[in-house]
Amino acid sequence: MQNIYQQGLDKNAANYTPLSPLTFIERTAYIYPQRTAVIHGQRRYTWLETYTRVRRLASALADHGIGEGDTVAAMLNNTPEMIECHFGVPVLGAVLNTLNTRLDA
């Protein structure tokens, strides 16, 4: 049963776009390029800057032979670079294996 306020608001191209994490960052960089995406200490990145850095990481990994089905391990703190890994590695169809630096052995 639909909520009374949802009647007549079926999903369509004008009000709904299914997004994966990869299509999310691409679409957000297109629609909100100058909005802040990441704040880490004194560093700030817009959505366009973040997306550009993600694409640059993906390109560098591809240049080193990383591709679909490969696994990339990353041992990083919770930094903008880790966010870039979460998007940049899957762009290639590879899997990201994160190694948390805050956990004891």
Predicted regions and their residues:
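Structured binding elements
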Residues: 93
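Flexible, non-catalytic linker and terminal segments flanking ANL/adenylate-forming cores
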Residues: 1-18
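Conserved AMP-binding/adenylate-forming core of the ANL superfamily
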Residues: 16-17, 26, 34-79, 83-87, ...
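Short beta->alpha connector loops at strand-helix junctions that form conserved
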Residues: 99-101
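Anion (oxyanion) recognition and catalysis
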Residues: 90
